[in-house]
Amino acid sequence: MAKIYYDDDADLSIIQNRQVAVIGYGSQGHAHALNLRDSGVDVRVGLRDGSSSIAKAEAQGLRVLSIEDACEEADLIMVLVPDQNQRQLYAEHIAPHLKDGDALFFAHGFNVHFGYIKAPQGVDVCMVAPKGPGHIVRREYSDGRGVPVLVCVEQDASGIAWDLTRSYAKALGGLRAGGIETSFREETETDLFGEQAVLCGGLSHLIQAGFETLVTAGYQPEMAYFEVCHEMKMIVDLIIEGGISKLRWSISDTAEYGDYVSGPRVIDDHVKKNMKAVLDDIQNGAFAKRFIADQDAGAPQSKKFREGEAKHPIEATGKELRKMYSWLAAADDDYTEGSVAR
C-alpha cells in the first residue's frame, strides 16, 4: 500500500523560508500561486512578455515577472506549463538561472522521466501533483479543505528534498486530504496509460463504437446518443461516489445482469493485450518520442486527428440534443467548439 502524508507530517516553515517562482498561470498555476501565497509563502509568477495571464495574476494580487527574472530571484521553481513547451522553456529561460541548492518542482513527470529535462546535480527535483483541476484545488483550499496530491522526489541533492516537498504540498492544501508517495516513473506512466487506454482514448472510442453500432443497425442517432453517451455522467458519478460496487447497487437488475454477462464480451482478453501494448509504448518511450516529434513539427498529426474526430456524426447529434437541456447551455461557457483549451 502507498504511504500517505498529512498536515502533521510536514513543516510549513520550510517552504515559508524559500523564494518560490510559479512558472505559468493556467488552471494549475493560479491555484499553486494563490494557495502558497495564502499559506505565507513568498511567491512570484513568471510569465512570457505579452502573456494574457499577466493582468489576471496582477489583479489577484500577485507579483508578476519575466520568466528569467522570476527564476533568478527564486530558489524554488514550480514549472506549470504544457508538457510540449517545458523542454525549450527550461533550456532557454530556467536552466541558466539554476544554482546549487535550488529546487525544481513539477506537477507531472513527463519531461523528467523521459529525459527531456535534466537538472544539474546540485538541484533538487521534486513533484507535487494535485489529483484535481486547478479551480477545484483553489476552491477546496479556500473552504478549508484540500485535494489529494501525489508527492515524489527524483533527485535529492540537498538532503532535505522530501521535507521540502511535503512542506510545499502542505502549503498547497494537499496534505489536508492526503499526499500519496510515488515516483516520477510511476506517476508518468500510470497517468499516460490512464489517459490513453481508459479515461480519454478508451472511453471516447468506446462511446463512438457504441454509437456507430446502434446507428448502423437502424436506430435513430438521437436514441443512440442518449444511450451510449449522455447517460455516462450518471454512471461516472456513481463510480466516483462509491466505486463500481455502488454503480452495480444503484442500477436495475437488468442492467446489472447485462454488465456481468456482456461486459466481458466487449472488454475481453484481446482488449487487455492491446492495453498492454499501449503500456509498452509508454514504458519504452515510444509514445513520448512520437508526441514530441509531432509537437516539434508544428503538431500536424494532432491537428489532423482533432479535425477528423470533430467530424464524427456523434458530435452533430450531441450538439443538437444538448440544446434541449437548459442547464447545459452555460455549463461550458469557457469552451469554444473547434478550439484547444491550452
UniProtKB/Swiss-Prot annotation:
Pathway: Amino-acid biosynthesis; L-isoleucine biosynthesis; L-isoleucine from 2-oxobutanoate: step 2/4; Amino-acid biosynthesis; L-valine biosynthesis; L-valine from pyruvate: step 2/4. Belongs to the ketol-acid reductoisomerase family. One of its GO terms (biological process) is L-valine biosynthetic process. GO terms for cellular component: cytosol. Substrate binds at residue 252. SUPFAM superfamilies: 6-phosphogluconate dehydrogenase C-terminal domain-like, NAD(P)-binding Rossmann-fold domains. It comes from the Bacteria. The keyword Magnesium applies. Involved in the biosynthesis of branched-chain amino acids (BCAA). Catalyzes an alkyl-migration followed by a ketol-acid reduction of (S)-2-acetolactate (S2AL) to yield (R)-2,3-dihydroxy-isovalerate. In the isomerase reaction, S2AL is rearranged via a Mg-dependent methyl migration to produce 3-hydroxy-3-methyl-2-ketobutyrate (HMKB). In the reductase reaction, this 2-ketoacid undergoes a metal-dependent reduction by NADPH to yield (R)-2,3-dihydroxy-isovalerate. Residues 2-182 form the KARI N-terminal Rossmann domain. It comes from Cutibacterium acnes (strain DSM 16379 / KPA171202). Its cofactor is Mg(2+). This is Ketol-acid reductoisomerase (NADP(+)). The gene is ilvC. Residues 183-328 form the KARI C-terminal knotted domain. One of its GO terms (molecular function) is ketol-acid reductoisomerase activity. Mg(2+) 1 binds at residues 191, 195. Keywords: Amino-acid biosynthesis, Branched-chain amino acid biosynthesis, Magnesium, Metal-binding, NADP, Oxidoreductase. The active site is at residue 108. Binds 2 magnesium ions per subunit. HAMAP family: IlvC. Its EC number is 1.1.1.86. It catalyses: (2R)-2,3-dihydroxy-3-methylbutanoate + NADP(+) = (2S)-2-acetolactate + NADPH + H(+); (2R,3R)-2,3-dihydroxy-3-methylpentanoate + NADP(+) = (S)-2-ethyl-2-hydroxy-3-oxobutanoate + NADPH + H(+). Mg(2+) 2 binds at residues 191, 227, 231. NADP(+) binds at residues 25-28, 48, 51, 53, 83-86, 134. The keyword Nucleus does not apply.
